[in-house]
């Protein structure tokens, strides 16, 4: 028996910052690792709401165009200025408030202001002179292809779609399928790209946005040992605060949990797992239709199957007249 309890599970939005935060932390490195030019510099911005699917798709495209595409302008500008040995970006979605990051690795922590200045200067120039339309188009096509193909390798497609549902459903119970309905967005973005849409996104969310942070991670030798010592001291103090009976109960509970985890399930419990019956499986295999055509003297076989709008082309050549040493 139980009584229903009203639980407020809504995840609240973090309030925007009045100004960009400047945060410095240390991170552990091994003895002998260099301390000079081994910092991480990152510029991070909160981007709207995870429930805005079009905005999230657009920023995935924008991250590609600015930082991943060949000759990506922000990455190239930082590398040309020798800010770090590697530069990369990320757009973290699937959360209530996605964020966009630009990171320089193996950098000089004293060049933080230069790092930020180059990023902002490059973005301002893009807003003024326009995005590289080919990079935007390539990004849109790339993400549209991934969405259409939905290749999850060895993972079941239904399982992965079920996980994708939580990208919106966790934050709005009325929007479980928001991220499964993206096709129309790609067509819309192709049109908007020619109307200054992506330049406006840069101005609004990357240049005029104070809900952001500059994070510097500085290497420190021996930090891992310091943290381990602090943890050990904290645990020792906690143990000393316990009575003998409390310690014995913790030991007993731990043994009980380990035994519970290792014991085999009962037959009754195993029978509660839903299983497919033989009658649930279709005996008929999927039929493949081979429609044969002639195109300019070449035989073409067409298979009319569902591919979610993607055309797959395989070219087969007779190699009987090709010498063996030329066949890979």
What are these model-derived regions, one by one?
Residues 2-52, 64-117, 132-160, 164, ...:
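Non-catalytic beta-strand/loop surface segments
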Residues 112-136, 170-258:
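Ordered core of a single globular domain
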């Amino acid at each position: 028996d139980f009584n229903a309890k009203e639980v407020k599970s809504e995840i609240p939005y973090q309030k925007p910052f009045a100004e960009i935060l400047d945060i410095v932390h240390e991170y552990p490195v091994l003895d002998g690792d260099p301390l000079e030019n081994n910092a991480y510099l990152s510029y991070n911005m909160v981007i709207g709401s995870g429930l805005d699917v079009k905005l999230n798709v657009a920023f995935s495209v924008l991250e590609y165009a600015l930082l991943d595409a060949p000759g990506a302008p922000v990455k190239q500008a930082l590398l040309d200025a020798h800010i770090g040995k590697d530069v990369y970006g990320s757009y973290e979605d699937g959360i209530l408030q996605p964020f966009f990051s630009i990171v320089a690795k193996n950098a000089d922590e004293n060049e933080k202001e230069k790092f930020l200045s180059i990023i902002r200067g490059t973005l301002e120039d893009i807003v003024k002179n326009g995005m590289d339309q080919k990079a935007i188009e390539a990004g849109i096509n790339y993400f549209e292809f991934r969405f259409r193909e939905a290749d999850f390798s060895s993972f079941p497609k239904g399982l992965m779609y079920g996980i994708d549902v939580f990208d919106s459903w966790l934050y709005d119970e009325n929007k479980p399928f928001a991220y499964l309905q993206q096709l129309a967005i790609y067509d819309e973005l192709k049109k908007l790209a020619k109307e200054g849409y992506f330049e406006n996104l840069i101005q609004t969310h990357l240049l005029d946005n104070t809900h952001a942070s500059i994070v510097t991670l500085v290497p420190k030798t021996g930090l891992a040992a310091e943290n381990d010592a602090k943890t050990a001291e904290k645990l020792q103090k906690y143990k000393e605060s316990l009575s003998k009976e409390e310690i014995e109960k913790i030991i007993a509970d731990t043994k009980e949990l380990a035994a519970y985890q290792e014991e085999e399930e009962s037959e009754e419990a195993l029978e509660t797992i839903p299983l497919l019956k033989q009658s649930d499986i279709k005996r008929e295999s999927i039929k493949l239709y081979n429609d044969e055509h002639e195109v300019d003297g070449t035989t073409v076989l067409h298979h009319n199957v569902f591919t979610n709008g993607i055309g797959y082309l395989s070219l087969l050549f007779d190699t009987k007249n090709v010498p063996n040493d030329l066949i890979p």
